[in-house]
Amino acid sequence: MSKLIHTLEQLHLLRNRAVKDLSSKLATQQQLCQRLEKNIHALSNLVNHSAPEIQGNATMLNNQSFYKRNIQRVIDWQRQEQALATVEAQKLQGNLLAESRREKSLELVLDVRRQDLRQAQERREQKVTDAVSAQCWLRQQQAQRQR
């Protein structure tokens, strides 16, 4: 029984470590999502709050149009990256939830096994105590008969 508990404890440590690793990965992924959101916001501000439209100069208008188009491509790319990062974060969240459940169920099994071991030990100790008490009682009975 003790070997089983030791094995369960080792498995519990592994599951606990897996939960911590997944928590760390999820936190990193959420930071990435936030960083991408800030990038998108900052790039959108560049497009929306750039210099006012220049009138008359075709080259300047062309440059400004090219600039806004490139910024918009970067925004679109960042949105795609954000969507992928969000999907990955959701996947990690699901994995973390599943791993947490496995870790918790193993913890409950381990607690039950420990309790069973304690109860078995207490029963053995009680049997020894009962045996010693019975011997004392028998000796007292024999001593009283001999008197």
Language model segments and positions:
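Charge-rich amphipathic alpha-helical interaction elements
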Residues: 1-147
